[in-house]
Curated annotation (Swiss-Prot):
It comes from Mycobacterium bovis (strain BCG / Tokyo 172 / ATCC 35737 / TMC 1019). Keywords: Cell cycle, Cell division, DNA-binding. One of its GO terms (molecular function) is DNA binding. NCBIfam families: DNA_bind_WhiA. It comes from the Bacteria. This is Probable cell division protein WhiA. Involved in cell division and chromosome segregation. The gene is whiA. The lineage of its organism: Bacteria, Bacillati, Actinomycetota, Actinomycetes, Mycobacteriales. The keyword Transferase does not apply. InterPro entries: Homing_endonucl, Sporu_reg_WhiA_N_dom, Sporulation_regulator_WhiA, Sporulation_regulator_WhiA_C, WhiA_LAGLIDADG_dom. Belongs to the WhiA family. PANTHER family: CELL DIVISION PROTEIN WHIA-RELATED (PTHR37307:SF1).
């Protein structure tokens, strides 16, 4: 689904000048580099979609007044797909300084510039958008689903992890076969980050496929149950997970950490027994401790829902939900 995300992001209209600058800086940092050609600094970026190259060329001209040239490298031999190389030669050094790729002394900045790292939330979203357009990937929902960005170095990876943290998304920097990557694996976090970047339509498709896969996996497990008690237990687990998801939604940031942890375990491992959830907890807990925390989480959410006059956790346990289980 990588192309879907990039296509949607390349058409996104951004009004904030600061965010547009942050996106350009991030795109250049993650997709390109600085070269010295004939004693001059040349800014270059290699991209995999023509729409991204056109967006970057347009933004460089509108924001900085410099002309970028795009060269098309057709697929052939070792190149599996067409690539687009954007190059700013005549004003390369000026652009590099203005985007923060070079510091005041003319030295290359290894991570992301301070104005992006310490910018607004819009800037953090733009930094992720630029990085994803440059070198991002999104796999289909499943056991190994992930949103990933290949990074030019560990400093850039850490800057991206920090930007994700500011957006409320947990991301991890990893070195895989000598290459630095930033990875988001949690399904909810992937969905949230897609929306933050501006790929809401793709998120909806991704979430639908994720839900369909979960339902299919649950159905496959249930098909193997030959005991009515196991089937009832599975329905109870589906209902409990749905109630917990609703509870976390109702409480938002006000949910105590220890209750949130137990709730997330229930949601992430829908078919696991309380005993199994206890073993998965860090540190491990007894099944009674897990059950107690989930009970308190649901009770707290239901009380808040009553005060706020909104649907409580029981409202999501519909006949259709149980029938699908």
């Amino acid at each position: 689904m990588t192309t879907d995300v990039k296509d949607e992001l390349s058409r996104l209209v951004v009004k904030s000048v600061s965010a547009r600058r942050a996106e350009v800086t991030s795109l250049l940092r993650f997709a390109g580099g600085l070269h010295i050609v004939g004693g001059r600094v040349v800014v270059e970026a290699e991209l995999d979609l023509g729409s991204i190259a056109r967006r970057l060329r347009k933004e460089i001209f509108e924001l900085y007044g410099y002309t970028a040239v795009v060269h098309v490298l057709s697929a052939s031999g070792i190149r599996k797909s067409t690539r687009y190389v954007l190059r700013v030669a005549n004003d390369g050094e000026a652009l590099a300084r203005q985007t923060g790729l070079l510091d005041m002394r003319g030295r290359p900045v290894r991570g992301l510039p301070a104005q992006v790292v310490g910018g607004s939330i819009d800037d953090a979203e733009a930094a992720w958008r630029g990085a994803f357009l440059a070198h991002g990937s999104l796999t289909e929902p499943g056991r190994s689903s992930a949103l990933e960005v290949s990074c030019p170095g560990p400093e850039a990876a850490l800057a991206l992890v920090g930007a994700a943290r500011r957006l409320g998304v947990g991301a991890k920097a990893r070195e895989v076969r000598g290459a630095d990557r930033v990875v988001v694996r949690d399904g909810e976090a992937i969905g949230a980050l897609l929306t933050r970047m501006g790929a809401q339509d793709t998120r909806l498709v991704w979430e639908e496929r994720r839900l369909r896969r979960e339902v299919r996996a649950t159905a496959n497990r249930l098909a193997n149950f030959d005991d009515a008690n196991l089937r009832r237990s599975a329905r109870a687990a589906v209902a409990a997970a749905a109630r917990v998801e609703r509870a976390l939604e109702i409480l938002g940031d006000t949910v105590p950490e220890h209750l949130a942890s137990a709730g997330k375990l229930r949601v992430e491992h829908r078919q696991a027994s309380l005993e199994e959830l206890g073993r998965l907890a860090d540190p491990p807990m007894t099944k009674d401790a897990v059950a107690g925390r989930i009970r308190r989480l649901l009770s707290m959410a239901d009380r808040k829902a009553k005060v706020d006059g909104i649907p409580d956790t029981e409202s999501v346990v519909t006949p259709d939900l149980l029938e699908d289980a």
